[in-house]
């Protein structure tokens, strides 16, 4: 039988079998769990969603634990009104650009304001945050919710709080290991060298181009595979790219404490690799593939000085080591896609007994995309090391003796970034 599913925000979804009925009377019950859900407000405090006036949306941390190397890719498509666009798959730079309810300002600053534990951070800092350390994740969308931040919150606000310790008899230890495989959804297909030359000659004749035509001897020699040095036939894409790439991620965290002090500590190691074949190992001692190692440390400590006083220390350290080829990845891909397959072999053997006559000569001009892309790929590498330290010291004093619920909070923050 056909089943009709009815759902609405704040109500429990219900499925009803239609059968032969033409009129259905359906009652939805309120979703108490959704209405009781606590969201983090602009003041950094928790408030039940049912009592909220402004437009605020929270996402459960468990929903962010998906196979992704960046947090922005994890919440993409999971938050209404948030548009996320991933512009590249390059390791180390594959985070998404995101906007809350579109672009609301005319200035260059179109990204939302991001607050982690009371500290304003960049989208790169957000991407480096491990989902295992997140305790609350809220999006403030409209002017009512973001009023506290003034013009800084014109593009919306993302507020993230990290986990704290708990008064436990025994500490809680978590260990998580992830393995990921990256693979292109579609790869280009190329014709063989002889077909390439025949199509090239036909295009030159039709276009009236002054380019030199390939000789029939070269076409025949390439088709018969007589000599790979004189008649090369190279699929540069296959020579430069692997079919898959493997990424690994490990997180270890511990949570515990007592009545006076509680703590939460986490360490994450994330390894990403690109899809370039390591051709430099045939000639040099380095790896020409893109390789990213990221380390993240999160330490939160709360000290309860009295029944009404609390001192909190939060420290986040991010380290990143990026190694990549000298030549930009966009240029490398363009070389593989556009270079002629018949102008040069991948490499020449170091044999001078024939004075390299066996390699032949070219009767064509060597122009753009008619060189050796593998040679361009192995011209060297860049190694970039970045470190970010974010620290926060917070003191909170309850003033219930003046007015119940009144609190005084002082927050000092520090951030240092080096490259």
What are these regions, as identified by a protein language model?
Residues 209-212, 216-232, 318, 323-390:
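Acidic/polar loop-and-plug regions of large Gram-negative outer-membrane beta-barrel proteins
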Residues 1-297, 311:
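Short, small/polar-rich motifs associated with maturation and membrane association
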Residues 133-135, 153-184, 260-271, 275-350, ...:
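Transmembrane beta-barrel strand/turn architecture of Gram-negative outer membrane proteins
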């Amino acid at each position: 039988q056909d089943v009709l599913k009815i759902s609405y925000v704040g109500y429990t979804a219900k499925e009803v079998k239609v059968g032969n009925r033409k009129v259905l009377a359906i009652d939805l019950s309120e979703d108490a769990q959704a209405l009781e859900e606590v969201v983090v407000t602009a003041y950094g405090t928790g408030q039940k969603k049912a009592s909220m006036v402004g437009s605020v949306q929270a996402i459960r941390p468990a929903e962010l634990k998906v196979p992704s190397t960046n947090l922005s890719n994890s919440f993409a498509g999971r938050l209404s009104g948030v548009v996320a666009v991933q512009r590249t798959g390059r390791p180390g730079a594959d985070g998404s650009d995101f906007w809350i309810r579109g672009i609301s300002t005319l200035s260059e600053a179109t990204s939302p304001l991001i607050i982690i534990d009371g500290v304003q951070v960049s989208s790169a800092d957000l991407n480096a945050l491990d989902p295992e350390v997140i305790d609350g994740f809220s999006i403030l969308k409209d002017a009512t919710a973001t009023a506290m931040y003034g013009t800084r919150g014109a593009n919306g606000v993302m507020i993230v709080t990290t986990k704290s310790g708990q008064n436990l008899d025994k500490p809680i230890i978590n260990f998580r290991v992830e393995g990921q495989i990256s693979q292109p959804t579609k790869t280009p297909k190329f014709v063989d060298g002889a077909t390439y030359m025949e199509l090239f000659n036909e295009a030159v004749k039709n276009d009236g181009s002054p380019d030199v035509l390939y000789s029939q001897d070269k076409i025949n020699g390439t088709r018969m595979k007589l000599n790979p040095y004189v008649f090369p036939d190279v699929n540069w894409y296959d020579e430069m790219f692997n079919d898959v790439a493997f990424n690994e991620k490990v997180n270890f965290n511990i949570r515990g404490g007592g009545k006076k002090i509680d703590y939460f500590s986490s360490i994450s190691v994330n390894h990403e690799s690109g899809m370039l074949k390591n051709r430099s190992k045939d000639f040099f001692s380095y790896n020409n593939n893109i390789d990213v190692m990221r380390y993240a440390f999160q330490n939160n400590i709360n000290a309860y000085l009295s029944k009404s006083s609390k001192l909190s220390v939060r420290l986040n350290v991010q380290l990143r080591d990026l190694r990549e080829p000298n030549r930009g990845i966009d240029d490398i891909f363009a070389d593989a896609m556009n270079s002629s397959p018949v102008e040069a072999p991948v490499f020449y053997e170091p044999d001078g007994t024939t004075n390299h006559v066996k390699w032949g000569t070219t009767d064509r001009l060597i122009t753009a995309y008619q060189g050796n892309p593998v040679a361009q790929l192995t011209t060297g590498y860049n190694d970039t090391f970045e470190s970010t330290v974010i620290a926060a010291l917070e003191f909170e004093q309850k003033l219930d003796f003046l007015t119940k619920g009144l609190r005084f909070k002082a927050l000092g923050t520090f951030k240092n970034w080096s490259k």
